Each structure stands twice: as C-alpha cells, then as structure tokens.
Amino acid sequence: MTFIEKLSAVWQSQKTQLCIGLDPDLAKFPAHLKGKPDAILTFCKEIIDATADTACAFKPQIAYFAALRAEDQLEAICSYLRERYPHIPIVLDAKRGDIGATAEQYAREAFERYGADAVTVNPYMGFDSVQPYLERPDRGVIVLCRTSNAGGSDLQFLNVDGKPLYQHVAQLVADKWNTNGQCALVVGATFPNELAQVRALVGDMPLLIPGIGAQGGDIKATVEAGRTANGTGMMINSSRAILYAKADETFAQAARQVALETRDAINRYIA
C-alpha cells in the first residue's frame, strides 16, 4: 500500500485528520521519566498507545532525536509504529534539501533506516534535490510550500511574475513533480487565506498543516480553507499541545484527552 493509499484509508477508517507530532523535549517530560536511558522511547510509546485511534499520521521531528543522540530510539519508535499500528502512516519531519547525491542518502535514511511512509523536503534547490525521494513511488514526498512560521514570508511571499513564490511551488509540485501521485504540501494553519489559495491550485493533493495548538492557528478557519470537496485532504498537525498537556504520571491520558478534543473539533467543522 502506498503512502497516499494508507493515508486515504485511515481518513475513512478512523474518521480523523489529526496528525500527531512527536517532538520529545526532555525538559518537559514528567519527573518519573527524566534520567532514564530510554526516556524518549518510553514517552513516545505511551503517547502513541494513548492516541493512535485519534491519529491519521504520526510525525516524528528528527531534530529532537538527533540533538539528543537518540536516533536509535527514533528507529525503535518507527519499528513500534510499523508493528503495532501498520495502518497509520509515519511522516518523518526532516525538511531535507541537498544536491542529488546527498539527497539519495537522505532518502535511504528516511525510507530504509527509519522505514517512514513519507518525508518532508525543502524545494529550494530544485527538482534534482527532490528526485531521489520521488523515485520511490510508494512513499510520500511532502514539500514545504507556505510554512507556519512568521519568517516564512521573507522568501515564500516574494512576488515572482505577479504571484507569490509559494504559489509557484504549489503549481510546480502539482503539475510537474507529482507524476506518481505521491506528493503533498506543507501549508501552515496560521495563514488560512494562503491555505485556501493553495487548495484551489492543487485540487485534492494532501496537505500537511502545522500551526494549530501551541502556534495558535484556528481550527475552523483551517478546515474551511484546507478541506477537499469530499471533506478530507488534510493532516492537521498538533505536537506540543498534545504531548505536554500534563507533566506528571497521567501525561498519556491527558494527551489522549487533548487529541480527542482536537480530532472532534476538526470533525465538527467538516460535518
């Protein structure tokens, strides 16, 4: 099953478009986990088990693991997801962007080492920097387009031939890079007007939408701007608001409650 097929199936089977980010920050961990050698693995597994039925994808952010020399725990988390929840896509949030030969190694890292179903990439260096990922048609390639951070406007909103650069990226991916039907775009919930414009440009292409929760994006505006005609097409990501809902031994139950509330809020505006 391809990434897009798996994503479409879980949208329908679990009735959710909530993507849960796995961004382990030891400073925010419950006290009973701090100092343990496998704290990250334990924390993430408990979050996953508590929220799996609310999620259309899990999105580990690689920098949070690499900074702590915890790539082995990330491998274990991805293995756990594949074994226990094979129906839920793994999106490796790496935002890679490099020349072709290096990109080939990054693609191997994402899809072979970690076994991710999809990976985020940076389009700034052009097609040859993305091609190694596209050569695996069963895997998803999620391209940065209009990101949720304020500084994204520095480049993404530059006027190029009468249109902002992010619209050129959206059209380029939709018209030229998506020949295998495996692409998606990152578009922030913090910019609902731009989100609506991207949706109009790319049709039913999936959108990974960060920026709700701790970043303050509005769920109603996000759903109205980002949904497809059949009410799907979105991976609306929340990380910190779910992961760190509580910092005690009930952290997983608290995370589940926030995930349920977020999923239900998304569904309320789809209905």
Swiss-Prot record:
Pathway: Pyrimidine metabolism; UMP biosynthesis via de novo pathway; UMP from orotate: step 2/2. PROSITE patterns: OMPDECASE. Its EC number is 4.1.1.23. One of its GO terms (biological process) is 'de novo' pyrimidine nucleobase biosynthetic process. Gene3D superfamilies: Aldolase class I. CDD domains: OMP_decarboxylase_like. Transmembrane segments: none annotated. It holds the Pfam family OMPdecase. GO terms for molecular function: orotidine-5'-phosphate decarboxylase activity. The keyword Cell membrane does not apply. The keyword Lyase applies. NCBIfam families: pyrF_sub2. HAMAP family: OMPdecase_type2 (MF_01215). This is Orotidine 5'-phosphate decarboxylase. It comes from Janthinobacterium sp. (strain Marseille).
